[in-house]
C-alpha cells in the first residue's frame, strides 16, 4: 500500500485493491467501463488511498441483465431450502469479515464504528432469518364451491428483483431485500449508493465467493456501482418485475411513476419525519435517553431518526433540561475513534444543507436551544441541535437529514396524536407513557398513522422479525420480517 496509512491496511482483507477497483459484478465477472470515481472520507474529505472505483456503463448493465435472465431460470428451480442454505453460507461469509466490513462502512459512510459493525451484523441476522423462511413459503388450501374439488394457492418467484440502496444504510437495506428475494427464488440486481462504492464491492465479493463455491451462476447476484443513469435503467427495465428503492420521497415518486408506467411493482422506503411523544406520566429519564439515541445517532441520517419531540406541557421544561445537559456531553469526532458518539454528515453538500436549514428554521420563528452550527475545520461535522418551534411552522413538515430536533409542546393526548399525524411522512413514531389507555389508543385506528408504532422505546432500531416500512409519503413498502416475503413472489391460485 506504499505510503497509505496503516489504518487502511485492513481493506485488503476484504478484497479491495490498492490501485483501482472494478465496481461491477455482472455475469459472474468483475468489469467496469463507466466513469472512474473516488470516494471521500467524510471525517476529513480527503480521497481514501485505495478508493478509486470504475462505475458501470449502460453496456455493462445490459451484459449483467442478460446474464441475470439466464441465471434466473436456474435459481428459481433450486428447492427453497437449498436456496436458504446458500443464504446461510452468505451469512457465514459476512460473519467471518464482520469487523473489517463494519470498519469500512464507518470509514466510507461516516457512522460511528459500533453502528457500522451493528449494521453488517443486521445483514447477517437477516441471512439467519431467511434460512428459516426458506422452509415456510407456504401456500393455502381453500374450500371450493365445486363438488369433490379444492383450490390451491401457491407462491412462485418473480424472477429478478432490483434493489437500489441509499448511503445511510448501504448494507442493512440490501439485507432486508436481498436475503428475502434470494430465498424466494429471485435473482438480485443491486445498485449501491454512488458515494459508498467500496462497501458495495466488498459485500459483493463475499456473495460471489459463495456462489462460485457452490457452482452456481454468479449472475444470481448482480451488483453495480453507478449513479442515476443505472438507477433509471433498472426502473425502466421490463425484465425486472419488482424494484425496491430506498431514498428521498422526491426521487422515490419518480421511480414509482417510471416502474408503474411499464406495469411493474415497486417497494418504496422513503423519507421519515418521526416523532416521539412524552406524556405527563412518562418515565422522564428513559424518555430523555431514548430521544438522545434516536435524534443524534448516525448524525441524524437515519430514516427513523427522531426529528420531532412532542412534550406534554407539564414535563416540557424537565425533559429539555435533561436533553440540553446530555447534548453538551456528546463527543463529536472521527467515527473510528473510541468514545465518539457523533460522526460527520456524509458529504460536504449535507453540511451546507444543514447550514441552510438552520437559517430557514430561524426565519420561521425557530429558536436554537443548543447547537445550530457547523464545526469548523476538515470534515462534515455539525453540532447536534435542538430547536424550539411551533408545530405549525412549514419547515417542521419537511425532513432535514441532520441531527436537528424540533421541540414541540402539547396539552392533551389527542393533540399530540394530531401533531404526530400532521406531516406528509409516516414511517416511525413512539409514545412514552405508563397509561394502558393511552397505549391502546396509540396503537389503534385513532392513534399513530405510521408504519412503525412504538411504545416506550425510540423511533429507531426496528427489529428484523417485523415488517419494516411506512405509510403516506414514506412509500407504503414493507421489508424484512413478518409476511414481507410475499412482495417478492407472485401468487398462483388453481
From Swiss-Prot:
Entry similarity comment: Belongs to the aldehyde dehydrogenase family.
GO molecular function: aldehyde dehydrogenase (NAD+) activity
Residues the record marks as active site: 269, 303
Site feature: Transition state stabilizer: 168
Induction remarks: By water stress, low temperature, heat shock, high salt and abscisic acid.
Subunit note: Homotetramer.
Protein name per the record: Aldehyde dehydrogenase family 7 member A1
This enzyme's EC code(s): 1.2.1.3
UniProt binding sites for NAD(+): 247-252
Top-level division of the source organism's lineage: Eukaryota
Keywords (A to Z) from UniProt: NAD, Oxidoreductase, Stress response
Catalytic activity of the protein: an aldehyde + NAD(+) + H2O = a carboxylate + NADH + 2 H(+)
Database matches in PROSITE patterns: ALDEHYDE_DEHYDR_GLU
